[in-house]
Amino acid sequence: MEKIKIIVASDSIGETAELVARAGISQFNPKQCKNELLRYPYIESFEDVDEVIQVAKDTNAIIVYTLIKPEMKQYMSEKVAEFQLKSVDIMGPLMDLLSASVEEKPYNEPGIVHRLDDAYFKKIDAIEFAVKYDDGKDPKGLPKADIVLLGISRTSKTPLSQYLAHKSYKVMNVPIVPEVTPPDGLYDIDPKKCIALKISEEKLNRIRKERLKQLGLGDTARYATDQEELNYFEEIVSEIGCPVIDVSQKAIEETANDIIHYIEQNKSK
């Protein structure tokens, strides 16, 4: 079967049109809906539209477009009708409905949704912070962090840090293991921004046994230090005086929501 060609055309980067096209394609058997996406971003002139139209004529392609400027959208609509081409205007009908509902004209500015604002930069800054201060790499991050996660291994400190970073929180995580003395700065920061991640000995042992099996060491191998690590963890957490969340039976998203709830509650105190 010949591939279905889909032209994704936009006066911005074309991300919206491509997502819609791929969402539509995903609803069909890939063996029966073989496809090829042809991208035409940053359409700025009638000549650019003419190029898209010509390719669609030559390849019998479907045009999926998001054109915001009225003159470009109108020109595309006219050309599609003139040559009886298959097309979908993603933004046009919705913008017309919104305009009628609010009784206002749209901005008609391509790419406005991608405009970089303070919130975007804050999130990027938080993500970079989480990478830089992952696994207690540099204690200088402790006073700068919004949240400091403490825990032994296998408590999902790193994925939690990244998840929270995408919510724009600067997160540092510090491993608590008997062989390594916690950084001095840990005792100097506000314990309200520290969260200790606890895991049951049974769950920890099960995770580690599975890990050993993956390494080819056999399912009878076991860690002898589980209880020692947990005891040391309890000792450090008690000294710091921070709250503890048991992550033994929790998904990362659930733990993250608990952390956010606690942090936001204490901000107002």
Swiss-Prot record:
Q: Does the keyword rRNA-binding apply?
A: no
Catalytically driven reaction(s): N(tele)-phospho-L-histidyl/L-threonyl-[pyruvate, phosphate dikinase] + ADP = N(tele)-phospho-L-histidyl/O-phospho-L-threonyl-[pyruvate, phosphate dikinase] + AMP + H(+); N(tele)-phospho-L-histidyl/O-phospho-L-threonyl-[pyruvate, phosphate dikinase] + phosphate + H(+) = N(tele)-phospho-L-histidyl/L-threonyl-[pyruvate, phosphate dikinase] + diphosphate
The protein's enzyme class: transferase
Judging by the UniProt lineage, the source's domain of life is: Bacteria
For this protein, the Enzyme Commission number is: 2.7.11.32, 2.7.4.27
> What Gene Ontology molecular function terms does this protein carry?
ADP binding; ATP binding; phosphotransferase activity, phosphate group as acceptor; protein serine/threonine kinase activity
Is the keyword Cell inner membrane in the record? no
Matches recorded under Pfam families? Kinase-PPPase
Its keywords, alphabetically, are:
Kinase, Nucleotide-binding, Serine/threonine-protein kinase, Transferase
Which InterPro entries does its entry note? Kinase-pyrophosphorylase, PPDK_reg
Which residues does the annotation say bind ADP? 151-158
UniProt lists the family membership as follows:
Belongs to the pyruvate, phosphate/water dikinase regulatory protein family. PDRP subfamily.
- Function statement: Bifunctional serine/threonine kinase and phosphorylase involved in the regulation of the pyruvate, phosphate dikinase (PPDK) by catalyzing its phosphorylation/dephosphorylation.
Query: What's the name of the protein?
Result: Putative pyruvate, phosphate dikinase regulatory protein
